Amino acid sequence: MGIFTIASQHIRFAVKLASAIVLALFVGFHFQLETPRWAVLTAAIVAAGPAFAAGGEPYSGAIRYRGMLRIIGTFIGCIAALTIIILMIRTPLLMVLVCCIWAGFCTWLSSLVKVENSYAWGLAGYTALIIVITIQTEPLLAPQFAVERCSEIVIGIVCAIVADLLFSPRSIKQEVDRELDALIVSQYQLMQLCIKHGDSEEVDKAWSGLVRRTQALEGMRSNLNMESSRWARANRRLKAINTVSLTLITQACETYLIQNTRPESVTDTFRELFAEPVETVQDVHKQLKRMRRVIAWTGERDTPVTIYTWVGAATRYLLLKRGVIGNTKISAAEEEVLQGEVVIKAESAERHHAMVNFWRTTLACMLGTLFWLWTGWTSGSGAMVMIAVVTALAMRLPNPRMVAIDFLYGTIAALPLGALYFLVILPSTQQSMLLLCISLAVMAFFIGIEVQKRRLGSLGALASTINILVLDNPMTFHFSQFLDSALGQLVGCFLAMMVILLVRDNSQARTGRVLLNQFVSAAVSSMTTNTARRKENHLPALYQQLFLLLNKFPGDIARFRLALTMIIAHQRLRNAPVPINDDLSAFHRQLRRTADHVLSASSDDKRRRYFKQLLEELDVYQEKLRVWEAPPQVTEPVARLVFMLHRYQNVLTDN
């Protein structure tokens, strides 16, 4: 799409962004706020951020959720700033350095929490730094400054939310309904591929695509939950559908793997049933009814366990899907499905990556402090703030370098655009509030169009331009002050980008190895006779880690197959009829301890030693299963697991 083109679907959000900025400006001046610029800047960032991420108008609830995160982050940052000032007001240099460490700590935390919640911690880090830097000349005004910042940011967020509600926000419900129908058809087609036992590359492409779509549906569920409380019932059902969809993928892929060694396990009856093509959800529903009749006639024992489980999961999917689309009262049958299992959350595999982010942010802020003190530049503080903002917000995203470049382009574009407004437009509007609002609305409208196109530098240009304009009360026009602010932003972004480029993040290989070992640990831990452990649902957490693996190593099919095999082993062993006795229970605990040692080992040598010990213990465990006459439903998945661990031993132990 060209830089000068305006698509019709982009106009509504551009008007919404302009309205949010104008409303924040009007309220700020009407109530005689000290710095209305903060309210305007907050309204712009809260409204434009989700649009840039979505590549279009954000769905209903996204702006409100981002606003709530900004309020939480601001309050945490203000409390931290006041605490640091109270404890270290007599040592200004130490106070600033501790603030740099606080910014790094918040970046570390934001790297470990869910991506959608990381914004609050990133904001908490640089908010404290902004307050500490701003009150250097008058430290006794810190409480007043913190209260003013909180109140003006809340006003900006309220204005953004009001503008969002005024222009009928887009509901994601119809997208959810369409995706639910399309997803079950794709699930059926994956099962057809697996039963045909065709090309492995085609199967890999199909299941990895379904993992991404299931993850995307979970993101839609979060948006729907933010949209309105009336979707609470749909939200509960969609949570369960996430697990059901992942179960369908797992059972289909296990069907494919079983046929590698035992192609006769899938009977001709089911091959014929799955041979019929399906195009719509009605076709899937019709086929499932036929399969349930066949299963009822032939009996569960004569039905392959993966197909039996798959048909049951697909039936539950259709039941829950119907409830989501109609948003009806939850029936007794649905309630039984919804209360089935306790979902376990995934443990972060990016601790080393988080520590790299901590050092990047801390070093960048300290470098800014040294630059400020060494040069004595009046806008060194502005450069420091930009360093903190760029590093705090960039680190959690997949490509921090591109975020830094986006900010750098934005600050470069803000220099001529800001100069036009500062020297020509704003001085001409001093006698009319209406003209001032119109002038800013025009700028917001056109930048809002570019933000939705995800134009590089557009979001940074919007924030940087508003930041250097004199939207204070009263407005004063000193060109030297404007130039200092603009250059301070530019230098800050450049220094932040240099730190991101120089402090390399070599944690990718380590993260990949940790993820794979987490899959191994989950598979080993599923060997248990404890009823409570068996009821724990690890599937969403395991697929969340698989999704991270897909993003970290795109195209590495061997890793994906290994991870998927571990997930299949986990699911099969979790439901396997393991003989119940004290001997096996004690050995299960020993296996879990050894798997935990592999996961937490601090060096490659220790990891290899513990992994070798785990393989030896698994050989002993297989012998114990033979002694206790365990059925094939137990011995076969254990043998498959041991074979995979032997085959990929180097990948699982070496960095």
From Swiss-Prot:
Specify the superkingdom.
Answer: Bacteria
Annotated TM spans:
13-33, 38-58, 69-89, 93-113, 121-141, 152-172, 370-390, 407-427, 431-451, 459-479, 482-502
Q: Which GO terms describe its molecular function?
A: transmembrane transporter activity
Keyword Membrane appears in the UniProt entry: yes
- A Gene Ontology CC term for this entry? plasma membrane
HAMAP family, A to Z: AaeB
Write down what this protein is called.
p-hydroxybenzoic acid efflux pump subunit AaeB
Query: Organism, per UniProt?
Result: Enterobacter cloacae subsp. cloacae (strain ATCC 13047 / DSM 30054 / NBRC 13535 / NCTC 10005 / WDCM 00083 / NCDC 279-56)
Q: Which gene encodes it?
A: aaeB
